[in-house]
């Protein structure tokens, strides 16, 4: 069989995203490809194609940024790395005509953040990879899952929901803001007994990575009880950074304004042990804040990559929630908590480990998970579903 000429049309048609080969039981060598639309270096103005892999080459690693290399005389850019057999994560490419970003040999963490901040608005998904979405920072990303990546409940066999989610506009008097909220119901349980889940960053889980088919599938398979789901739009990054980190006004508005509005549309149980509040990053911090301050309403907390360093980004000081727990100003007694963090997000992992150590006396009601991933929705989506399953498991015993 004749070998295909590198960079030819038939060669590109043989590529379907990253390619890998096993090195040993634990590691794979993975190669990424990008096709330069301008052609070879003779015609193209592209100087760099940066590879941004969440938890591998991103700013959380404090490592040297990685650029693809062009195969001389072709339209082919490539980059090779090694990944664990159970790794899962998102990635994007950043082609640029600039060669002056990351010009310092060993940039520090702040220089890395600033460099990526300049580049990420130009990021693109991998054109060879069919599985892509708009990431939390607003740019497109693609998915990569190695052969032994852990199963993500429900995402393997989604089912179309019987009734679509209902989108409403919540005009908050307390917050002086209007935003979208999605209400979704599953199953046919008695309305007043249905558990409630409040999902922060609702626009992402409603639109970028819709959870409706997955929740439907898990309910049909009796891994989740029939329930009411409320997804709250963060509006934008500015509002998100103000409202989610330990903001009493936000949670008072949710309880006094939003939940009565939702209940008129889709009745649910008032019991705290049937109520989950779930979030990621600032949302994870916010979820635990809600549980600690209003345990009579929010008895179950699902926190993924929670920003427990807040408000001290450098990670040199303890975050405010940990300080309050240590001082006895708040207590997690009586809460059921899922605490999840990725080993590839070092500062967040350290903050979560410190929090877990403080919560250890009530470890019977805490699900602590370390995942081989970074600050990444592709990892969070599996943990979100597993967390709901774990937190609501006692409800199946209640019904038996």
Swiss-Prot record:
NCBIfam families: PRK10439.1. The lineage of its organism: Bacteria, Pseudomonadati, Pseudomonadota, Gammaproteobacteria, Enterobacterales. This is Iron(III) enterobactin esterase. Its EC number is 3.1.1.108. Belongs to the Fes family. Induction: Expression is increased under iron stress. Repressed by Fur under iron-rich conditions. Catalyzes the hydrolysis of ferric enterobactin (Fe-Ent). Is responsible for the release of iron from ferric enterobactin. Also catalyzes the hydrolysis of iron-free enterobactin (Ent). Cleavage of ferric enterobactin results in a mixture of three hydrolysis products, 2,3-dihydroxybenzoylserine (DHBS), the linear dimer (DHBS)2 and the linear trimer (DHBS)3, while cleavage of iron-free enterobactin yields only the monomer. Hydrolysis of ferric enterobactin is less efficient than hydrolysis of unliganded enterobactin. Disruption phenotype: Mutant is unable to produce linear DHBS compounds.
């Amino acid at each position: 069989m004749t070998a295909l000429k590198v960079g030819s049309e038939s060669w590109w048609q043989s590529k379907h995203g990253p390619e890998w080969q096993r090195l040993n039981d634990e590691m794979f060598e993975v190669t990424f490809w990008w096709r330069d639309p301008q052609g070879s270096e003779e015609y193209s103005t592209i100087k760099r194609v940066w590879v941004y892999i969440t938890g591998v080459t991103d700013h959380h690693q404090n490592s040297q940024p990685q650029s693809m290399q062009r195969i001389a005389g072709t339209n082919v850019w490539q980059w090779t790395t090694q990944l664990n057999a159970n790794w899962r994560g998102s990635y994007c490419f950043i082609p640029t005509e600039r060669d002056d970003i990351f010009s310092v040999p060993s940039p520090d963490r702040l220089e890395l953040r600033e460099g990526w901040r300049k580049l990420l608005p130009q990021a693109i998904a991998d054109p060879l990879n069919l599985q892509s979405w708009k990431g939390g920072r607003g740019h497109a990303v693609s998915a990569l899952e190695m052969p032994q990546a852990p199963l993500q409940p429900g995402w393997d066999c989604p089912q179309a929901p019987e009734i679509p989610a209902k989108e409403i506009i919540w005009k908050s008097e307390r917050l002086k803001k209007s935003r979208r909220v999605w209400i979704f119901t599953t199953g046919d349980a008695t309305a007043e007994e249905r558990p409630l889940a409040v999902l922060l960053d609702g626009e992402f889980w409603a639109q970028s990575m819709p959870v409706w088919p997955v929740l439907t599938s898990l309910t049909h398979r009796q891994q989740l009880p029939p329930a009411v789901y409320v997804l709250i739009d963060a509006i934008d990054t500015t509002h998100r950074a103000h409202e989610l980190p330990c903001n009493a006004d936000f949670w008072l508005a949710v309880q006094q304004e939003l939940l009565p509005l939702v209940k008129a549309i889709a009745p649910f149980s008032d019991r705290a042990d049937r109520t989950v509040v779930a979030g990621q990053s600032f949302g994870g911090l916010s979820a635990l804040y809600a549980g600690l301050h209003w345990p009579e309403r929010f008895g179950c907390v699902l926190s993924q990559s929670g920003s427990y360093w807040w408000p001290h980004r450098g990670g040199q000081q303890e975050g405010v929630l940990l300080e309050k727990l240590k001082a006895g100003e708040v207590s997690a007694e009586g809460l059921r908590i899922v605490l999840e963090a990725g080993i590839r997000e070092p500062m967040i992992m350290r903050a979560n480990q410190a929090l877990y150590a403080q919560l250890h006396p009530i470890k019977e009601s805490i699900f602590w998970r370390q995942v081989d991933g970074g600050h990444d929705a592709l990892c969070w989506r599996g943990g979100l579903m597993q967390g709901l399953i774990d937190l609501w498991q006692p409800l199946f015993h209640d019904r038996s």
